[in-house]
Amino acid sequence: GSEMCIRDRHKEIFMTTQTQQTLPPSIFPARFQILSGSALKLLACILMLIDHTGVLILANWKPALRVLFTIGSTEVTWYRIVRDIGRSAFPIFCFLLIEGFLHTRNRRKYGQNLLLFALISEIPWNFVFSNTWHHPTQNVFFTLFLGYLGLCALEALWEKPVLQLSCIVGLFGFSYIFHADYGWHGFLLIMIMYLFRTRRILQALVSTLWMNYEWKMCFSFISINMYNGKRGFIQGKAAKYFFYLFYPVHLTILVILRQILFLS
């Protein structure tokens, strides 16, 4: 009866499909939509590796800090170039979080995995910035987990807007004081990208305006608009957990390399 109608309406409003025909309008024509979810995940990991190589290796290597040229008052170094390239990783991960949330068979397990790897990643994250067991900020998995909770609130409470807004404001406040990577800006970016998920061009414009202090992130929406709605080559638990593990493992390797090359 009415309960079935509510569920159907809920599905119609909030769920998207994996088929090419029902993809949201893109900046690019269909022939350029060639990136699967797996390809986007691989790209985001590569960009993140480039970024963190800048943080841990190039920041300590004097040749990478030499000024190549200036643009206005900005001094351009190899370190700066690498960090700017890496800025594109985060919006892609936000996009993949939303896609995963919409299409996963088990949302509770999805959230548990995000929290588990946030906890696992905290030790290498702390060593990245303070080279100790403790650092006042938290890793990006916590940002994604808070975003996941926000998505749960948006969907579960869509018929109770006051309670829904209260939950989002509460999560926003927590993200502000918790100091996870990208902070409250990152949390609200996930909410913005979700709300504009069926309008990719608007999603790109509003997200870029929101994260204007990191304007280099706008380049991530080129690849996001090349998404074809397909899962891609990542199949099975082993491949899935490889990408979860990539974050803490690559941080650990880079921390060890920094210690060997510059701090020992």
Role assignments for model-derived ranges:
Residues F14-S264:
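Alpha-helical transmembrane segments and their immediate juxtamembrane cytosolic regions
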Residues G1-I6:
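Short, small-residue-biased leader/transition segments that mark boundaries at the very start
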